[in-house]
Regions:
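A general "terminal functional-core" signal
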Residues: 1-239
Length: 239
């Protein structure tokens, strides 16, 4: 089995890229890419995932920060079960852009599994397509800001077919800078598949402001990760 993201990163480094960011927003820890580049200070891996206490592969805790000489380049945010749209978006926006600004990547490679969705049968996060789409659009903006628009977006896991279809459609829409409603009609040929039903945003998402990341009561996972990682980059930790 081949790791498509790792192969792409290796190719980029071999063809002139100096620094590459791998951003994994799947429900599972991005352990494969992290392990391959554990000792490489030129690759920054960021994984926002459900805690290994509850979900395979059982790794990806805040204290896992990279090998000798590459400390601070493995970033892990281990979330508890039941994390909501707003909590997840707050964590993503608090962690990712400050590190991108410091690391100054030549390329961003991101992995967008659909299993953080609340209907997924394996994971226990409580995200809607609306929140996931907001994150995808944010990655597109960050790629423009910090990587001269050089962004490779990959699909990933997901175990409910309509959630996968809607999530990946939103990834494509974000990469094309197109706004697409999460309630857009599925193709007629798919009508026999289970459907998500009402995809209304959870409370707070409609008014979510990424510039106002919670500071007074930051999420515990955010505190743990920033305390472990941010000092390596001269950034103030939360909490």
């Amino acid at each position: 089995m081949y790791n498509d993201a790792a192969i792409a990163i290796r190719w980029l480094l071999a063809h002139g890229a100096q620094r590459v960011v791998y951003l994994d927003l799947d429900a599972h820890h991005g352990d494969g890419v992290e392990k391959i580049f554990w000792d490489d200070p030129n690759v920054l891996t960021i994984s926002v995932h459900e805690s290994g206490l509850y979900l395979f592969p059982g790794t990806g805790y805040a204290h896992e920060i990279g090998g000798q000489g590459a400390e601070g380049t493995a970033v892990n945010v281990a979330l508890p079960r039941g994390v909501t749209d707003e909590e997840w978006l707050q964590v993503v926006h608090a962690i990712v852009p400050p590190l991108l600004k410091k690391f100054r990547p030549d390329f961003i490679i991101s992995q967008h599994g659909a299993d953080p969705h609340r209907s997924d049968p394996l994971a226990d996060l409580e995200l809607t397509i609306d929140a996931m789409a907001q994150a995808y659009r944010s990655v597109e903006v960050w790629a423009q800001q910090f990587a001269a628009g050089r962004w490779v977006a990959l699909g990933g896991g997901g175990y409910r077919v309509d959630a996968v279809a809607r999530a990946w459609t939103q990834v494509l829409a974000a990469s094309a800078n197109v706004e697409l409603a999460s309630s857009s009609r599925m193709p007629d040929g798919w009508e026999g598949s289970p459907t998500l039903g009402d995809e209304g945003a959870c409370a707070g998402i409609a008014n979510f402001d990424p510039t106002k990341v919670m500071a007074e009561r930051p999420h515990a996972a955010l505190v743990q990760t920033t305390r472990a990682i941010f000092p390596y980059w001269g950034l103030p930790a939360y909490g």
